[in-house]
């Protein structure tokens, strides 16, 4: 089967479109013939080796995190799906494997694809959707009706879905986005937009109950200062908090991951404590039940999968160039 294979860490030159052996469905798994895959910032980070200290790869390896496709076969014990079913999934975070014509995935990580959008476009839902859903949910921000939420960098895949889900929860949603991104976040349900190119969050003087940060970087102190005491900041881009890397790290690297997370986040955790704010970095986990709920919202017309661009597999380099430009409004998809 054809696959995008990561041959070493590096830039796009480290990736090759080549033939590799096809996987088979083990017990409790489904084998999916890929229709399309979603590209995500974490894919570029993986390629560059950002996680190699705690989760080193054995090269060559097939990367990729999410896909849509048609069930080819099912393994022993699988009753929820059958050959021919249209499905979407977030694949194993430790094994990856989405960037291939066939992928074997645990059945409990899979959901029936939404009927309301093309199967190709549905590939953009799993990772961004589950990240937003879990961040806003009871395990993390626990967003409640009427609360004031800030989402930074909201015009991308995760941000647009998070904006919509927060709006559906009855929160007052402020986002940061460029002028070009404002129409997208407004359509998703943003109540207020801060153009980060013309003013900072602090300059606006707004106060928030909770913040969902998608940017990271040197703005963290400013964000903490904008949150009411007793509030929360959850990030997928800031320094990792203690325990947050455990499931990502290989077992032999978990002691190192624990040290890295404590040291890397020490400064921001001190600042958060001083501000009376809870700080947390988190990584989403595959969840077929949660994914099915997102599909329900899509089919009900309450949630959209915003697609920035679609590329054929042969143009994978251009697809990654678009992703890494940081100008995509919504998802960049690669069609198989």
Locations of regions flagged by a protein language model:
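Glycine-rich beta-strand-centered segment in the early N-terminal region that forms part
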Residues: 21-39, 51-96, 214
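Mid-domain Rossmann-like dinucleotide-binding core that forms the NAD(H)/NADP(H) cofactor-binding site
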Residues: 125, 129-198
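A short acidic, Gly/Pro-enriched loop at the edge of an enzyme's catalytic core
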Residues: 202-210
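Glycine-rich phosphate-binding loop and adjacent beta-alpha segment
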Residues: 219-300, 336
């Amino acid at each position: 089967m054809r696959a995008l294979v990561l041959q070493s860490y590096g830039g796009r030159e480290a990736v090759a479109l080549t033939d590799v052996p096809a996987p088979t469905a083990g017990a409790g798994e489904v084998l999916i013939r890929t229709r399309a895959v979603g590209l995500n910032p974490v894919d570029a980070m993986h390629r560059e080796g950002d996680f190699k200290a705690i989760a080193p790869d054995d090269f060559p390896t097939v990367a990729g995190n999410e896909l849509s496709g048609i069930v080819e076969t099912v393994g022993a014990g699988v009753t929820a799906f059958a050959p021919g079913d249209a499905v979407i999934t977030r694949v194993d975070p430790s094994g990856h494997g989405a960037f291939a014509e066939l992928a074997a995935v645990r059945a409990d990580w899979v959901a029936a694809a939404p009927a309301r959008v093309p199967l190709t476009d549905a590939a953009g839902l799993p990772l961004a959707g589950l990240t937003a859903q879990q961040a806003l949910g009871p395990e993390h921000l626990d967003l409640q009706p009427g609360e004031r939420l800030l989402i930074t960098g909201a015009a991308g895949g995760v941000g647009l879905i998070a904006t919509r889900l927060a709006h559906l929860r009855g929160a007052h949603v402020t986002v940061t986005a460029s002028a070009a991104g404002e129409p997208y976040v407004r359509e998703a349900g943003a109540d207020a937009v801060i153009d980060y190119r013309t003013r900072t969050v602090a300059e606006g003087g707004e106060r928030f109950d909770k913040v969902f940060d998608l940017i990271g970087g040197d703005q963290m102190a400013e964000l903490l200062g904008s949150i009411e005491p007793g509030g929360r900041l959850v990030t997928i881009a800031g320094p990792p908090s203690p325990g947050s890397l455990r499931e990502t790290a290989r077992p032999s690297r978990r002691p190192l991951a624990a040290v890295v997370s404590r040291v890397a986040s020490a400064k921001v955790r001190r600042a958060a404590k001083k501000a009376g704010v809870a700080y947390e970095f988190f990584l989403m986990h595959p969840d077929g039940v949660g994914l099915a709920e997102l599909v329900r919202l899509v089919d009900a017309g309450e949630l959209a999968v915003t697609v920035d661009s679609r590329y054929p597999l042969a143009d994978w380099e251009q697809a990654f160039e678009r992703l890494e430009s940081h100008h995509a409004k919504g998802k960049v998809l690669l069609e198989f």
